[in-house]
Amino acid sequence: MWGLEVLLLLPMASFALYPEEILDTQWDLWKKTYRKQYNSKVDELSRRLIWEKNLKHISIHNLEASLGVHTYELAMNHLGDMTSEEVVQKMTGLKVPPSHSRSNDTLYIPDWESRAPDSVDYRKKGYVTPVKNQGQCGSCWAFSSVGALEGQLKKKTGKLLNLSPQNLVDCVSENDGCGGGYMTNAFQYVQKNRGIDSEDAYPYVGQDESCMYNPTGKAAKCRGYREIPEGNEKALKRAVARVGPISVAIDASLTSFQFYSKGVYYDENCNSDNLNHAVLAVGYGIQKGNKHWIIKNSWGENWGNKGYILMARNKNNACGIANLASFPKM
């Protein structure tokens, strides 16, 4: 046991022994890699202290992972100078309506008779567009919604097109644009509006603008939506297998999520009652004995595993992944 304790202290000791030589070089390299600039020396110092704290967390976690404590690894990325609280505040955006309740009219009834395949990956089927970056705009709900619509468009027409999250940010009056929103509100908008523009017709700018929807740029329509029974991962698995990519909501508030790199993500501190981020389930499978969901995020390809994360499946609805799952009808 003493050996483990000594090992766990090694990363902390290395930071204490080489505060200037090692950290200065790594800090400069990180700033150059991600083109970071700061308004003042004071601002840079405060950001560096956050970065150092995150780097220590990553180092210790990965040591524990090498000893079998965790099923996933972390890595420094472009969010290195942000706290987890700042990430949630600036880069998530899920807002569930206070009056939200499921109705029988929109409830998805799975086909329990036929067996779902052991694994599915819609990236390999051509249902998934490239990873996008929402930037510091609380528009995760728009990217999640667009991803589900893109999958259904591919399924129906055979064509994969980038649809416009900015169209949703600007035009879904029931949501709050970069201030946050909810996926079923987006699906309802597309249904009532009789369409959503393509990304080419209505490009993403990452801030709230006036609604500029143009029917000539319309690329997809929607006939409504269905919601997965709350907290039911088996129903979610059936939906992913039978329907396509599904919009889901998760708790993305932990530092472990912020710096996820590879492996199957499971953090017992992830709170299924604290849903703050919308993402897209594009498949599921198993890696080294660990069942997982394949999740597409909207924080760019520099985050996670080229923009994706494998999240634990069938582990008591980890991170609340099956609590607010839905998809559009097309």
Swiss-Prot record:
Disulfide bonds join 137-178, 171-211, 270-319. One of its GO terms (molecular function) is collagen binding. It is a peripheral membrane protein. GO terms for cellular component: apical plasma membrane; aryl hydrocarbon receptor complex; external side of plasma membrane; extracellular space; lysosome; nucleoplasm; nucleus. Keywords: Cell membrane, Disulfide bond, Glycoprotein, Hydrolase, Lysosome, Membrane, Protease, Secreted, Signal, Thiol protease, Zymogen. It catalyses: Broad proteolytic activity. With small-molecule substrates and inhibitors, the major determinant of specificity is P2, which is preferably Leu, Met > Phe, and not Arg. This is Cathepsin K. It comes from Canis lupus familiaris.
